[in-house]
């Protein structure tokens, strides 16, 4: 079968494998690329190519991640796989690899294990919207009742963390046998690919979401008014549209009277573009870096939220010592630092470098935020942690 050229017209979906160590995540990743390449064209990736994950940096944190790509007839997938548990924690919290859906790998020989639970919880906290289960190593279990029991346990665990356990697709397979070319088990990989296509909806593109621009700079242009600059995070801003200025101070309304890029006037600015937006009736001192421009009514300012955070280890350039309750670092959202206080979970006295922990944060100024927003934790400009807003509280 001839290799087809990369079709940009196909919807692009980001997925990844999660689950307990040695349950077969990397073997499954290799099996998916191999079976889909054989069936639909594309490149197969061997286990050792994937397992030898390169180091990358995301927000100053070292993460080992493998990226593979594969196609089904209707979609193009980018898939991440991490070698170690710590890499998953970092990856999910920093959003280095945002997932539109995840494949939870559970070995039928073991059933759910501690990291199975932790990855499901992390998925819930960081906003992984869909999980599909691949029950691996089913070739090693002869007992149908045992398989049903494991399946039931996995469904209960998913439901416990607010995923729809009863309706989650579960595929019974053997990644190793599929990788070895056994047709019976290859069919299970195609079944899994079918669920990726049908169960994970097409992700909404940034440009189709409501307009938001984090303000990086503010200028006053004599005779024209106040211009804010920044990169449009999502949506489109057109000349003549109303906007809200959200965060830090009271929310204000204004109208966009001009959009410019590279000193050229445009009639709109789109997601991903660096633009200047001219605002009607706003004085230079009424607006500042760290606020956002947004479509009215689409985002609110908040000071209190529950978060999932990863604290950098000493080797990553993080703290050398633990911190305790009463810790007051800066929280860096989009373009600015805001000081905040923390509440640790019950029974947790201190947090060590290299830990991941759930904490409630209260900021001294409100920031425009939604669940899923990423942030860095800093001390005097140095990054000591990374986090994600799990739930806005007030």
Curated annotation (Swiss-Prot):
CDD domains hit by this protein: EF_Tu, EFTU_II, EFTU_III
Annotated S-S bridges: none
Ranges where the record places region G1: 19-26
Domain tr-type G per the UniProt entry, residue ranges: 10-204
Residues covered by region (G3): 81-84
Protein EC: 3.6.5.3
Annotated region described as G5, given as residue ranges: 174-176
MF term (GO), any: guanosine tetraphosphate binding
Residue numbers binding Mg(2+): 26
Gene3D superfamilies assigned: P-loop containing nucleotide triphosphate hydrolases, Translation factors
Region annotation (G2) ranges: 60-64
One GO CC annotation: cytosol
Family: Belongs to the TRAFAC class translation factor GTPase superfamily. Classic translation factor GTPase family. EF-Tu/EF-1A subfamily.
Function: GTP hydrolase that promotes the GTP-dependent binding of aminoacyl-tRNA to the A-site of ribosomes during protein biosynthesis.
Protein name: Elongation factor Tu 1
Gene that encodes it: tuf1
């Amino acid at each position: 079968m001839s290799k087809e050229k990369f079709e940009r017209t196909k919807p692009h979906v980001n997925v990844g494998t999660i689950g307990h160590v040695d349950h077969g995540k990397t073997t499954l990743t290799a099996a998916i690329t191999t079976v889909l390449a054989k069936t639909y064209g594309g490149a197969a990736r061997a286990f050792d190519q994937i397992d030898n994950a390169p180091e990358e940096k995301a927000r100053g944190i070292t993460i080992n991640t493998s990226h593979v790509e594969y196609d089904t007839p209707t979609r193009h997938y980018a898939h991440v796989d991490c070698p170690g548990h710590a890499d998953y924690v970092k990856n999910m919290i920093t959003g280095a690899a945002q997932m539109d859906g995840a494949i939870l790998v559970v070995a039928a020989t073991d059933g759910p294990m501690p990291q199975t639970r932790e990855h499901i919880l992390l998925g819930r906290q960081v906003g992984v919207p869909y999980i599909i289960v691949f029950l691996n190593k089913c070739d090693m279990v002869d007992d149908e009742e045992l398989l049903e029991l494991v399946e039931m346990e996995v469904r209960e665990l998913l439901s416990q963390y607010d995923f729809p356990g009863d309706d989650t697709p579960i595929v019974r397979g053997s990644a190793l046998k599929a990788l070895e070319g056994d047709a019976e088990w290859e069919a299970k990989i195609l079944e899994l690919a079918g669920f990726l296509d049908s169960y994970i909806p097409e992700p909404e593109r940034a440009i189709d979401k409501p307009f938001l621009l984090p303000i990086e700079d503010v200028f006053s242009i004599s005779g024209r008014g106040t211009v804010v600059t920044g990169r449009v995070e999502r949506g489109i801003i057109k000349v003549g549209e109303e906007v809200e200025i959200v965060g830090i101070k009271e929310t204000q309304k204004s109208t966009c009277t001009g959009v410019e890029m590279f000193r050229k006037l445009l009639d709109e600015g789109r997601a991903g573009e660096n633009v200047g937006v001219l605002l009607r009736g706003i004085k230079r001192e009424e607006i500042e870096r760290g606020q956002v421009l947004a479509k009215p009514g689409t985002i609110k300012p908040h000071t209190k939220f529950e978060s999932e955070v990863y604290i950098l280890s000493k080797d990553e350039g993080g703290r050398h010592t633990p911190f305790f309750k009463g810790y007051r670092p800066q929280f860096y959202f989009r373009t600015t630092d805001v000081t905040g206080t923390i509440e640790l979970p019950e029974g947790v006295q201190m947090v060590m470098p290299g830990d991941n922990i759930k904490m409630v944060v209260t900021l001294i100024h409100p920031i425009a935020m939604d669940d899923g927003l990423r942030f860095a934790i800093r001390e005097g400009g140095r990054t000591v942690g990374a986090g994600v807003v799990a739930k806005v509280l007030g």
